[in-house]
């Protein structure tokens, strides 16, 4: 019975996420209903002492990343830097290679620290223009943007500042550059297979006489290239974030040691920080802050007058994203404490391979919740100890666990109820019926890539 209750709680959360209801509201409802059916007297203590404790821990660790990332993306947008980068890349590669152009420019922006949602809004007008000039069906735009923004630059490439690559650092005491070779191999697999798939889809459509089409909704205004920011200046903040993230990642342990103790006159105790667990987060926070200041310094003319309103929207968006994921993390903490979850853990433990075990667990929960960070948070909150013990027994480095968890989170997360998918289709004026098939193909490629990387590790031992 306890197992059925646990599954019912997961199914309920999946249902409300799919229907578009607030996870912030329904994650605690799902968790506490499960507790109510087990032990009614435990509901309030579990809510305060477990659900909220887990939620607070997540916010404490990761909210600054959500906040600084959102502000960085917003000032990049307001300054016109993102438009300049997109226009430059497409101009260099050409409209005749529209798909590769859009994928690469989305790669550049997301790997530089711009949020996925900002990339969708920044890239779409240029994608529409390039596809129109190349007479490529508009319905292929979402799949193309998904390959560029929702895949390997989010979780595979070493050093990516996206949250999916940062969450594992606190569980496995790694940094954002964990397992660089495996990450690059996975990224190359997704890129090559993704481009091959999209090219095949384009040629099939053109062979059938299908072009860009007419009567579309959400058609953007023609892009004006007048007064675009110098592309070198526009790229500078992305370079600053990437370089300083690496520098601070190296320097943090040298400056603070493995553990740091700080005392202040007004405190009767020392503040103790595990630099092994927090170093990657601190490094990215400082790098994003430097990136924001770089944009403000070089793009203040475009930002002036709109900074206040723009950053308000960014802060609101970061709060929503962080609280959504924190609620799912709290949900995972409660579910992991229920008797029924023991059955789930035992079933997963029966999978003899720890990396396959981790990949299946994380990508399944990402699919259920419709969130890469949410699914990974639930899985690692509940099962990271089990993953670590199994990996240590098999002499698998924590870096490999990190990379597999990050890549698996970006596997089945992009199912139809995923927020980024819904936003992408809304912005492009297309429907699930028209374009989700291609997004799902990229989703399948991302999922397969995790197991390709696992296979490469076992065959070669490369990390």
Residue ranges and their predicted role:
Residues 89, 424-445:
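Interfacial loop-to-transmembrane junctions
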Residues 38, 42, 181-310, 423, ...:
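Long, contiguous bundles of hydrophobic transmembrane helices that form the permeation core
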Residues 25-28, 48-83, 108, 274-340:
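Core transmembrane alpha-helical segments of multi-pass membrane transporters/permeases
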Residues 19-23, 59-62, 73-83, 109-122, ...:
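Short helix-coil transition sites and intra-membrane helix breaks within transmembrane domains
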Residues 70, 84-86, 118-130, 159-171, ...:
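Re-entrant/interfacial helical elements at transmembrane boundaries that shape
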Residues 5-17, 28-37, 66-71, 105-110, ...:
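Hydrophobic core segments of alpha-helical transmembrane domains in multi-pass membrane transport
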Residues 63-69, 92-129, 322-330, 351-389:
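Hydrophobic alpha-helical transmembrane segments of multi-pass integral membrane proteins
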Residues 96-109, 136-153, 179-184, 188, ...:
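Alpha-helical transmembrane segments of multi-pass membrane proteins
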């Amino acid at each position: 019975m306890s197992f059925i209750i646990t599954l019912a709680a997961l199914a309920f959360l999946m249902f409300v996420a799919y229907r578009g209801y607030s996870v912030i509201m329904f994650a605690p409802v799902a968790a506490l209903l499960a507790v109510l059916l087990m032990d009614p007297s435990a509901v309030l203590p579990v809510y305060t002492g477990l659900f909220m404790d887990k939620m607070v821990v997540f916010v404490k660790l990761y909210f600054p990343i959500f906040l600084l990332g959102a502000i960085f993306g917003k000032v990049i947008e307001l300054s016109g830097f993102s438009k300049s980068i997109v226009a430059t890349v497409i101009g260099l590669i050409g409209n005749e290679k529209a798909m590769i152009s859009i994928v690469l420019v989305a790669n550049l922006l997301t790997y530089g620290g711009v949020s996925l949602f900002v990339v969708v809004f920044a890239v779409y007008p240029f994608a529409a223009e390039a596809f129109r000039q190349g007479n490529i069906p508009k319905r292929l735009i979402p799949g193309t943007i998904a390959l560029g923004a929702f895949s390997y630059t989010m979780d595979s490439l070493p050093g990516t500042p996206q949250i999916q690559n940062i969450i594992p650092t606190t569980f496995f005491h790694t940094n954002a550059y964990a397992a660089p070779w495996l990450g690059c191999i996975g990224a190359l697999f997704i890129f090559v297979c993704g481009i091959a798939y999209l090219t095949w889809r384009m040629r099939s459509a053109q062979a059938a006489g299908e072009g860009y089409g007419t009567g579309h909704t959400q058609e953007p205004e023609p892009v004006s290239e007048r007064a675009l920011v110098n592309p070198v200046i526009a790229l500078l903040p992305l370079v600053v974030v990437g370089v300083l993230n690496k520098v601070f990642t190296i320097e943090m342990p040298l400056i603070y040691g493995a553990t740091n103790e700080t005392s202040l006159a007004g405190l009767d105790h020392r503040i103790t920080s595990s630099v092994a667990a927090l170093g990657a987060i601190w490094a990215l926070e400082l790098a994003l802050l430097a990136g924001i200041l770089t944009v403000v310094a070089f793009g203040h003319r475009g930002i002036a007058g709109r900074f206040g309103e723009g950053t308000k929207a960014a802060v609101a968006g970061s709060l929503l994203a962080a609280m959504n994921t924190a609620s799912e993390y709290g949900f995972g903490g409660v579910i992991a404490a229920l008797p029924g979850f023991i059955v789930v853990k035992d079933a997963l433990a029966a999978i003899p391979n720890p990396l396959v075990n981790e990949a299946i667990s994380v990508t399944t929960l990402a699919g259920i919740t419709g969130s890469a960070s949410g699914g990974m948070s639930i899985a690692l909150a509940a099962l990271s100890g089990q993953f670590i013990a199994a990996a240590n027994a098999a002499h698998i480095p924590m870096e490999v666990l990190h990379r597999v968890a990050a890549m698996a989170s970006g596997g089945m997360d992009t199912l139809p109820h995923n927020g980024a998918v819904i936003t992408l289709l809304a912005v492009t004026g297309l429907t699930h019926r028209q374009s989700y098939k291609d997004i799902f193909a990229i989703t399948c490629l991302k999922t397969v890539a995790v197991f390709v990387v696992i296979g490469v590790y076992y065959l070669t031992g490369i990390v």
